[in-house]
Amino acid sequence: MKTVTVKDLVIGTGAPKIIVSLMAKDIARVKSEALAYREADFDILEWRVDHYADLSNVESVMAAAKILRETMPEKPLLFTFRSAKEGGEQAISTEAYIALNRAAIDSGLVDMIDLELFTGDDQVKETVAYAHAHDVKVVMSNHDFHKTPEAEEIIARLRKMQSFDADIPKIALMPQSTSDVLTLLTATLEMQEQYADRPIITMSMAKTGVISRLAGEVFGSAATFGAVKKASAPGQISVNDLRTVLTILHQA
């Protein structure tokens, strides 16, 4: 299986990498939170752009991205607009969503973009090609904050992302029971052992699913999300606790 290298970070080998999400509403908060995040122990900074109020002003968005890049130049920067239908803060049109991601790619400020699988097949394929032409990696994602589908469906979605040339397929699902967590872990393991030729990220959300955020190295998830301050999804634990557990499991 091939790994994915972003800056000096190799994703897909060793302990799962820690991603943290910064969710600031304006440029002043972007600056202050970036300074606070700089002291935390994590591997990838995700900027959740859907929390940013001045979204229609592309210059403002990119000015904020520049602050993040300059504050933490060594950290891979993942640019993520999470759509309302997949648990995000704002709803925008597909056209605006694609344009925003293209602007991020054009800026040269971001290392990775998050692209939702169900945006539309043609738009997704074109945006992946555009990102790769500009040396930007793509985390292709799907989120369901209500339920966990069958393992076959989870695997089908991850394989579809892989077929669309995502650098890292990602899926996050809400368990309604403990057995749903096992379904997610079973699907992750089967994907990893039978189909994946690149790193994948999977997680089961909420308190019930926390084990999935810790056991990635065992089952085949290459990264996990932790919280510096406010969690960006239910079930995230603090980065310091997360690093401790990931290290224990890695060294066992």
UniProtKB/Swiss-Prot annotation:
Catalytic activity: 3-dehydroquinate = 3-dehydroshikimate + H2O
Pfam families per UniProt: DHquinase_I
S-S pairs: none
CDD domains, sorted: DHQase_I
Positions that bind 3-dehydroquinate: 21, 46-48, 82, 213, 232, 236
Coiled coil: none
Domain of life: Bacteria
Listed pathway(s): Metabolic intermediate biosynthesis; chorismate biosynthesis; chorismate from D-erythrose 4-phosphate and phosphoenolpyruvate: step 3/7
Assigned EC number: 4.2.1.10
PROSITE patterns: DEHYDROQUINASE_I
Leader peptide range in chain numbering: none
InterPro entries, per the entry: 3-dehydroquinate_DH_AS, Aldolase_TIM, DHquinase_I, Type-I_3-dehydroquinase
Listed GO biological process terms: 3,4-dihydroxybenzoate biosynthetic process; amino acid biosynthetic process; aromatic amino acid family biosynthetic process; chorismate biosynthetic process
Annotated keywords: Amino-acid biosynthesis, Aromatic amino acid biosynthesis, Lyase, Schiff base
Molecular function GO terms recorded: 3-dehydroquinate dehydratase activity
Keyword Amino-acid biosynthesis: yes
Active site: 143 (proton donor/acceptor), 170 (schiff-base intermediate with substrate)
Family membership: Belongs to the type-I 3-dehydroquinase family.
Subunit structure: Homodimer.
HAMAP family on file: AroD
Stated role: Involved in the third step of the chorismate pathway, which leads to the biosynthesis of aromatic amino acids. Catalyzes the cis-dehydration of 3-dehydroquinate (DHQ) and introduces the first double bond of the aromatic ring to yield 3-dehydroshikimate.
Protein's name in the database: 3-dehydroquinate dehydratase
